[in-house]
Structures are given as C-alpha cells and as structure tokens.
C-alpha cells in the first residue's frame, strides 16, 4: 500500500510482504504523482509531474539519481506507460485528444509518438489491451461506456483498434489485469451500487463483485503478488476525530479480505511494487 501526500510532497509505502515502512520526500504541492519503472530495474520509482514547468522529476531506484525531462505543457494530463515495450516507463501526456509520448529508448526526445485518439472529454485508460507487452493508447467515453484502444501490435500496417462497450454513464473505469493473462481487462466501478464489473479477456467471462461504499476511492493493484489485479478501495475518514484512511482489499489468490489503515484523508493512493530495502523514519506514515 502506498500514498502520496500533496500537503508535504511525501510518499508513504507499506511493504505487505515484510511489513517494512518507507517515507520519501519527493515532490511538492501542486505536483501530480506518476510512479513507474523509469530505469527498468523492476521497481517503481518515485516520480512527479510538475505542471508549473511541465517537468517530470524521477528518483531512480537503481542508483538514486534524478531523471528530469521536460515534456508536455502545464495543462496536460500525464499518462506514463511502457509504450515501446523495452521494460522502462516512458514519459507521456495527453493534451485534449492527442497523446504525446517520449520513448525511453531515445532519451534525447527525438523518438516520439504523437497520436490523436478519442475526444477531449474522454478519459485516458492506457494499458496493454493486445498483450504484446507494450502500453496501448486508449480512452474511455463516460457518456456511453465505450473503450477504444489503438493496438501497438500492428505498427507496420494500417493501425487497428479494439472497441468495447463496457460500462454506463457515471461508471469509473479501472485499468488492471484481473485474470493474470498479461492483457488489460475492461473494468468499471459503479458508485451507485458499489459493484465492480469486469470483462475478463482470458475467457471472455463476466465478473461482478460488490466491494466498497459509494464514497470509496477505487485502488486496484496486485497486493498478494499472484500476478492478478485485486479489487480494492480506499475509504476516507469516517469520523471527525479520525483522519486516517482505510484500505479494503479482496485478494484474488484466496478470496480473503484484507483491511488496514494507511494514509490520511486527502492522500493520493499510488499502489505498486516499490520494493525499497531501506526503511526511513516513518512516524507520521499513518
């Protein structure tokens, strides 16, 4: 479990395997957290996108060095992912209906992808929808629940897309691989009935699971390490005297519920595999 605290720019990570705690100051108020594996070492790096100067600040886990490319504009939406399949997260932004990607294979910024996709009112839902190991440019249309992704597996021919109607107006799209087949599934969380609706790509079966409350914030991730995305929510403070947030996780490996307090009201959930081996002072983590 991990959160980024906008008020002080600190990341708080709880390792669910060994129980270790990590606190890392990285970022400042106004930044947007963009964790990813920017150095290709298999660990998520602490990273933020700063709209004021359109600069990405990445603290590389492999050597502790800072990677800080300028990419985008102040009003852009960051959409990092591994768009070239080299095992490293690429910096990318979405501006209105156009995606701008700087490929990590060429850090000079000369190798880029510029792709118009969807409408400005669509939501970005980048993921690997064709299972080729590359992040696909994709959008979700809130008005009718339509997903549309541009397949990266067909780069030399006429671009092909995947279109799926999955969801309804008001649903919240969730990006994850819930069946562990290395293909992003179509999934939504509907606050009105608190049901997760997932179309599993492995066998095209439907999974419906009631989980959470209408005011919860979805936070899917692989919390039990079985290679499948787990259904999870973060519940903000429930009383005026308790400012802590509570995580509720449904483990895909055994169906057991896990719950734990982690973070404060106003923190941004950033779950993932950080695997920090050093434990920083963490007196205010929770």
Q: In which residue ranges do the predicted regions lie?
A:
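Trp/Gly-enriched beta-strand/coil motifs that build multi-repeat beta-propeller-like domains
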Residues: 1-286
């Amino acid at each position: 479990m991990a959160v980024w605290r906008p008020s002080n720019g600190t990341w708080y990570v709880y390792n669910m395997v060994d129980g270790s705690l990590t606190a890392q100051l990285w970022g400042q108020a106004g930044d947007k957290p963009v964790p990813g594996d920017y150095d290709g070492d298999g660990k998520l790096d602490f990273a933020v996108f700063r709209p004021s100067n359109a600069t990405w600040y990445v603290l590389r886990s492999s050597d502790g060095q800072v990677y800080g490319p300028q990419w985008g504009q102040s009003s852009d939406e960051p959409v990092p992912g591994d768009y070239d399949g080299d095992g490293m997260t690429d910096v990318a932004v979405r501006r209105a209906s156009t995606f701008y990607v700087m490929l990590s294979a060429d850090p000079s910024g000369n190798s880029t992808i510029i792709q118009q996709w969807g409408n400005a009112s669509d939501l970005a839902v980048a993921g690997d929808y064709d299972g080729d190991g590359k992040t696909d440019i994709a959008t979700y249309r809130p008005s009718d629940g339509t997903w549309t992704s541009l397949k990266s597996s067909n780069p030399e021919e006429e671009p092909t897309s995947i279109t799926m109607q999955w969801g309804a107006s008001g649903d919240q799209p969730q990006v994850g691989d819930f069946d562990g087949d290395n293909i992003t599934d179509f999934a939504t969380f509907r606050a009105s009935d608190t049901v997760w609706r997932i179309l599993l790509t492995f066998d095209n079966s439907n999974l419906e699971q009631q989980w959470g409350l209408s005011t919860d914030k979805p936070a899917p991730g692989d919390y039990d390490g079985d290679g499948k995305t787990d259904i999870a929510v973060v519940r903000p403070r429930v009383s005026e005297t308790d400012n802590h947030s509570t995580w509720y996780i449904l483990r895909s490996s055994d169906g057991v519920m896990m719950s734990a307090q982690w973070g404060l009201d106003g923190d941004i959930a950033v779950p993932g595999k950080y695997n920090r081996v050093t434990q920083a002072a963490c007196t205010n983590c929770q």
